[in-house]
Amino acid sequence: MAGPQDRPRGRGPSSGRPQRPVGGRSQRDRDRRVLGQNFLRDPATIRRIADAADVDPDGLVVEAGPGEGLLTRELARRAGRVRTYELDQRLARRLSTDLAQETSIEVVHADFLTAPHPEEPFQFVGAIPYGITSAIVDWCLTAPTLTSATLVTQQEFARKRTGDYGRWTALTVTTWPTFEWQYVAKVDRTLFTPVPRVHSAIMRLRRRPQPLLRDAAARSRFADMVEIGFVGKGGSLYRSLTREWPRSKVDSAFARADVHHDEIVAFVHPDQWITLFQLLDGSRGGAARGPGDQRGRRGRPGGGPRPDGRAGGGPRRDAGGRRTGDGRGGRPRPPRGGQA
């Protein structure tokens, strides 16, 4: 089970003739450094990760960075099938040999970020390099058939994304109607070999059986509201929203959602965001516009749908509310930090 060092964007050592040790480092040491390989060998933590994943005994599990395969074997004992992606050619070859008798395990020597999303429902599990955490999270969030993702990430990342500090990120709020984010447990850095500089944590994403906002168009409008709130120049969420919605409507919505007027946007709970949206959706007009001006933000009367049926004029979004294009018919954007 590999992870958590940063993986550089450059290429690793060539696969040609054996390289002579440099500075006392063996080829294996250099591979670990290039590929971000820190191995988790603590059996109790391995079981804790598998417990948190709560895998379907008849389902597919996709794993990234199996390393020495300890978590892979534990998952195979609990799941129907495991498909694991290993970028390190040496480890992939060894895993294929060691697991040859395990018919439920498929070892794929490839960069996980280039892997297609499975067409069938699946769960993701992995201890991943810090440097590509955001790219892997994006891969998971954009997978239509993903049911859950259990990741070992840098502890700081896990705490920020799950609201463990009492603050919430725009990514978490935007995807909240579709995904639940959970901080599971700290993983002490001393449990890895070699020992990284910071602690890790188990974080879990779970797709909700029914989205909190069931209409895809509503989720897209919700994502637009979240964007306005987080990038607005008003200083507070209240000031940002009153630039786009009537002040009286915002006052009423804040009172019913129990949000103070001076609340900083990061401290507003995602559930409060949902309430605000449900109370404000459909009343968008903006305090700065005159009483006779009902034009929407993009210059169409009432901010109504485009002739092509798309609501509003903002960027295209997937079912989870995440951007998938530039709103002008452009091609979908690749995940941040990922490979196109």
From Swiss-Prot:
S-adenosyl-L-methionine binds at residues 38, 40, 65, 86, 111, 127. Residues 315-329 have a biased composition (Basic and acidic residues). GO terms for biological process: response to antibiotic. GO terms for cellular component: cytosol. Keywords: Antibiotic resistance, Methyltransferase, RNA-binding, S-adenosyl-L-methionine, Transferase. Its EC number is 2.1.1.-. It comes from the Bacteria. Residues 1-25 have a biased composition (Low complexity). Residues 301-314 have a biased composition (Gly residues). It is an enzyme of class 2 (transferase). Residues 1-37, 284-340 are annotated as: Disordered. CDD domains: AdoMet_MTases (cd02440). GO terms for molecular function: RNA binding; rRNA (adenine-N6,N6-)-dimethyltransferase activity. Pfam families: RrnaAD. Belongs to the class I-like SAM-binding methyltransferase superfamily. rRNA adenine N(6)-methyltransferase family. Involved in erythromycin resistance. This is rRNA adenine N-6-methyltransferase. It comes from Aeromicrobium erythreum (strain ATCC 51598 / DSM 8599 / JCM 8359 / NBRC 15406 / NRRL B-3381). The lineage of its organism: Bacteria, Bacillati, Actinomycetota, Actinomycetes, Propionibacteriales. The gene is ermA.
